[in-house]
Amino acid sequence: MYFSEQNKMIRKLARDFAEKELTTEILDEVEESGEFPQEILDKMAKFGFFGIKIPKSLGGSGGDHMSYVICMEEFARVSGVASVYLSSPNSLAGGPLLLSGTEEQIEKYLKPIITGKKKLAFALTEPGAGSDAGGMSTTAVDMGDYYLLNGRKTFITMAPLCDDAVIYAKTDMSKGTRGISAFIVDLKSEGVSMGKNEHKMGLIGCATSDIIMEDVKVPKENRLGEVNKGFSNAMKTLDVGRLGVASQSIGVAQGALDEAIKYAKERKQFGKRIADFQAIAFMIADMATKLEAAKLLVYNAASLMDNKKNATKEASMAKFYASEICNEICAKAVQIHGGYGYIKEYKVERMYRDCRVFTIYEGTSQVQQMVISGMLLKK
């Protein structure tokens, strides 16, 4: 229905890579150390995953949004945190540059993250401005030759690992969201510091921290796009970002369902497999049906984007439903495993922790409902 021959080839490539490289031993080590192996990231870059949906003319692999969804799904099925690294250059990090970057900015910032030579963070959220991104207090004052940035961004994925960050700041405090501009900030600049490395529930192996800016001088050529047009850049970037989280969600959910089915067939109680009990069998049927529905929402949103159609509502629907049912499926997978599901030795324990953030980051479920209802009910 949705997949081209190229899409099918990319699915096989992504699945084979994830299953071969992301072994249980490596993922257990990531959980213990909190660090993701650089050699695997280098291989992901070499295979073209970091530019899977970026045009070849810009150094990417030239795939479509469906190819991106497929790669995210297959990586997340094995490792949620690996899919975060895959997502970044294709989505939140690369997106702002694809939308508004100059030739020089593309060359200097986009191409190096595609090849894996550099990492770029997306910094929108603040301590007092999460869902209400327009309520940010970070400022950028035009000083003539440069902008002077002051403020704090919070919960920034990969911030401690990144070379640069796309920072959104108020250039006109009187205009609300229409007074926000985007900037590319060198994180080694004077006045930039990192908050503590957050100890997260899940997605261990991808550091998260605040970015603090105190009188940071940013060259004029590092403004991304037009003055006061940054909020539009951020929102358009998040459309693709939400597609990415939806893809993560169906991937992790598929992994959890696979583990639940496998365990239900092997585990015996009362003299028979627990899969033979209707309570378990119906639970699995429910999980599989909801997952299939979520996949169709995700693929539909990707298809609309590939056909150059507005998919804001559909991306929000996909993100909302897929993330919610992923949490439900992972919880049921743990339940099917019984006590073993609570033990780190079993994969579903990690999946259960990893998926919890899917209903929160890149727009909470409640924000998605606001977007969906707003588009349906507007005059």
Curated annotation (Swiss-Prot):
MF (Gene Ontology): acyl-CoA dehydrogenase activity; FAD binding; oxidoreductase activity, acting on the CH-CH group of donors, NAD or NADP as acceptor
Binding residues annotated for substrate, in chain numbering: 131, 239-242, 363
Reactions catalysed, as given in the entry: hydrocaffeoyl-CoA + 2 reduced [2Fe-2S]-[ferredoxin] + 2 NAD(+) = (E)-caffeoyl-CoA + 2 oxidized [2Fe-2S]-[ferredoxin] + 2 NADH
Keyword NAD: yes
Superkingdom of the organism of origin: Bacteria
Primary localisation category: cytoplasm
Enzyme nomenclature, EC number: 1.3.1.108
Active-site residue numbers: 362
GO cellular component: cytoplasm
Sequence positions that bind FAD: 122-131, 155-157, 267, 278, 335-339, 364-366
Cofactor list: FAD
Group of enzyme by EC: oxidoreductase
UniProt-listed Pfam families: Acyl-CoA_dh_1 (PF00441), Acyl-CoA_dh_M (PF02770), Acyl-CoA_dh_N (PF02771)
SUPFAM superfamilies per the UniProt record, alphabetical: Acyl-CoA dehydrogenase C-terminal domain-like (SSF47203), Acyl-CoA dehydrogenase NM domain-like (SSF56645)
Subcellular location: Cytoplasm
Function: The Caffeyl-CoA reductase-Etf complex catalyzes the reduction of caffeyl-CoA to yield hydrocaffeyl-CoA. It couples the endergonic ferredoxin reduction with NADH as reductant to the exergonic reduction of caffeoyl-CoA with the same reductant. It uses the mechanism of electron bifurcation to overcome the steep energy barrier in ferredoxin reduction. Also reduces 4-coumaroyl-CoA and feruloyl-CoA.
Assembly: Part of the homotrimeric caffeyl-CoA reductase-Etf complex composed of (R)-2-hydroxyisocaproyl-CoA dehydratase CarC, and the electron transfer flavoprotein (ETF) alpha (CarE) and beta (CarD) subunits.
Stated name of the protein: Caffeyl-CoA reductase-Etf complex subunit CarC
Organism encoding this protein: Acetobacterium woodii (strain ATCC 29683 / DSM 1030 / JCM 2381 / KCTC 1655 / WB1)
The encoding gene: carC
